[in-house]
Swiss-Prot record:
This is Calcium uptake protein 3, mitochondrial. Tissue-specific calcium sensor of the mitochondrial calcium uniporter (MCU) channel, which specifically regulates MCU channel activity in the central nervous system and skeletal muscle. Senses calcium level via its EF-hand domains: compared to MICU1 and MICU2, MICU3 has a higher affinity for calcium. MICU1 and MICU3 form a disulfide-linked heterodimer that stimulates and inhibits MCU activity, depending on the concentration of calcium. At low calcium levels, MICU1 occludes the pore of the MCU channel, preventing mitochondrial calcium uptake. SMART domains: EFh (SM00054). EF-hand domains 1 and 3 have high affinity for calcium and act as sensors of mitochondrial matrix calcium levels. EF-hand domain 2 is degenerate. It is found in: Mitochondrion intermembrane space; Mitochondrion inner membrane. Specifically expressed in the central nervous system and skeletal muscle. InterPro entries: EF-hand-dom_pair, EF_Hand_1_Ca_BS, EF_hand_dom, MICU1/2/3. Ca(2+) 2 binds at residues 483, 485, 487, 489, 494. It comes from Homo sapiens (Human). The lineage of its organism: Eukaryota, Metazoa, Chordata, Craniata, Vertebrata.
Length: 530
């Protein structure tokens, strides 16, 4: 700082006083310490006044000098930071930040700072590491299901993203990952070694996903298919199997099963968020692993497909797809699709095995049971039951209920003595939710007759619609949760509307969205467009 002062303000020459009362000036213009008289002689009042004026003037000059130095240093620091972050502003046009037309003919200046380097676009069959900024950019063009899959996926192989079995369990039982996910890149050889530990379908159990943990992969279309399984009644299992079994031999082979890959892909394209085609191409590569041709069997049915669910799309279009150009391209699709845990589990390591209905039914039932067991155990703390309040909390997850405390207080005060909900009661209730549409028809009959439904009528309607018998304690607990007006009656508005949200956990999209990353990506896109 002293050296900087000398450069900015060189010390003035010391000139002799013009009169006997003018004080001498020292370095930097400060009055020199002198008595101008005999030692020990006190200054006169006039000398004291002149010295005080000179001292004040010197302090003002010093203060302004220090402020100037600080301002100059601050401006230089800001400029350095901006240069380090954004590089040389002359590299692009001032309007949009992109290269001008003349940039193609003129040689580029050498880089002058550590600006952000452009990230290369991923090509098919090429493994790249994608930064967090690119993840947020692609989220702008993804649907809610695609964003959730990418949020929980942890494996990347040749540009395509996969979930592990553990990732899938987290995606359907938690709101968001505990830590930010990073995609672990695997080679084809490493992936095949991982799939070698997949058990055959006849060795499946209700702990399959928990036993595999990180030793397996699930593609995006399989993720959608598994979500369908979680929300369908057992009666729908036979329908699903018959859709795949086009030749009627009571067996499904790998080619027949892979039809869902193309059906779900085309269904999803109807819901794509329009925008940058390059970004959409990168997103399709991540989700499906290859770019399929634009002409598709389902393209002519686009308007009708938009309003359908994935399950309806699969049910209505599987046979149509198999007897169209998809059947002719079955070998091409099989060669493009990367083997996954489900494909190896169903059809063996060589893909030659066939799947019968008994094994298919057992797999779907085991998956539903496994997810319910995980949710139940997360609240039971090793006990055989969960509290009625915890049961209410589980039912209200993934719903649009803003103030859940009202429902929880109903249980807390209406059931002061905790009896608990067993796993059998817990499982039977969620099996009932998978038959909610049939139950809603029965419940609407009471609404049309302007009748409220009581506990006995509710229990009978459940049995008629689903064949399930609820225990009196389970029925009473359900009424205490949803009977907000405390009239011991249940209405369509109090129950059916909320349970429809709960049934489609993760399938209709979660109400908790990452607002800040989406806003930041949108703002960045808007700034770059100007």
């Amino acid at each position: 700082m002293a050296a900087l002062r000398r450069l900015l303000w060189p010390p003035p020459r010391v000139s002799p006083p013009l009169c006997a009362h003018q004080p001498l000036l020292g370095p930097w213009g400060r009055p020199a310490v002198t008595t101008l008289g005999l030692p020990g002689r006190p200054f006169s009042s006039r000398e004291d006044e002149e010295r005080a004026v000179a001292e004040a003037a010197w302090r003002r000059r010093r203060r302004w000098g220090e402020l100037s130095v600080a301002a100059a240093a601050g401006g230089g620091l800001v400029g350095l930071v901006c240069y380090q972050l954004y590089g040389d502003p002359r590299a692009g046009s001032p309007a949009t930040g992109r290269p001008s037309k003349s940039a193609a003919t003129e040689p580029e200046d050498p880089p002058r700072g550590r600006g952000m380097l452009p990230i290369p676009v991923a090509a098919a069959k090429e493994t790249v590491a994608i930064g967090r900024t690119d993840i947020e950019d692609l989220d702008l063009y993804a649907t809610s299901r695609e964003r959730r899959f990418r949020l929980f996926a942890s494996i990347e192989c040749e540009g395509q993203l996969f979930m592990t079995p553990y990732d899938f369990i987290l995606a359907v039982t938690t709101d968001e990952p505990k830590v930010a996910k990073t995609w672990k890149s695997l080679s084809k050889q490493e992936l095949n070694q991982m799939l070698a530990e997949t058990p055959p379908v006849w060795k499946g159990s209700s702990k399959l996903f928990r036993n595999l943990k990180e030793k397996g992969v699930i593609s995006y279309t399989e993720y959608l298919f598994l979500l369908c399984i979680l929300t369908k009644p057992h009666a729908g299992f036979r329908i699903a199997f018959n859709m795949f079994d086009t030749d009627g031999n009571e067996m499904v082979d790998k080619k027949e099963f892979l039809v869902l890959q193309e059906i779900f892909r085309k269904k999803n394209e109807k819901r794509e968020i329009k925008g940058d085609e390059e970004k959409r191409a990168m997103l399709r590569l991540q989700l499906y692993g290859y770019h399929s041709p634009t002409n598709s069997v389902l393209k002519t049915d686009a308007e009708e497909l938009v309003s359908r669910s994935y399950w309806d799309t699969l049910r209505r279009n599987t046979s149509q797809a198999l007897f169209s150009d998809l059947a002719e391209r079955a070998d091409d699709i099989t060669s493009l699709v990367t083997d996954t845990t489900l494909l190896v589990h169903f059809f063996g390591k060589k893909g030659k095995a066939e799947l019968n209905f008994e094994d298919f039914y057992r797999f779907m039932d085991n998956l539903q049971t496994e997810v319910l067991e995980i949710e139940f155990l997360s609240y039971s703390n090793g006990m055989n039951t969960i509290s009625e309040e915890d049961f209410a909390h589980i039912l209200l997850r993934y719903t649009n209920v803003e103030n859940t405390s009202v429902f929880l207080e109903n249980v807390r005060y209406s059931i002061p003595e905790e009896k608990g909900i067993t796993f059998d009661e817990f499982r039977s209730f969620f099996q009932f939710l998978n038959n909610l549409e049939d139950f809603a028809i029965a419940l609407n009959m009471y609404n049309f007759a302007s009748r409220s439904i009581g506990q006995d009528e509710f229990k009978r309607a459940v049995y008629v619609a689903t064949g399930l018998k609820f225990s009196p304690h389970l029925v009473n607990t359900v009424f205490k949760i949803f009977d907000v007006d405390k009239d011991d009656q249940l209405s369509y508005k109090e129950f059916i509307g909320i349970m429809k949200d709960r049934l489609h956990r993760g399938f209709r999209g979660y109400k908790t969205v990452q607002k800040y990353p989406t806003f930041k990506s949108c703002l960045k896109k808007e700034l770059h467009s100007r």
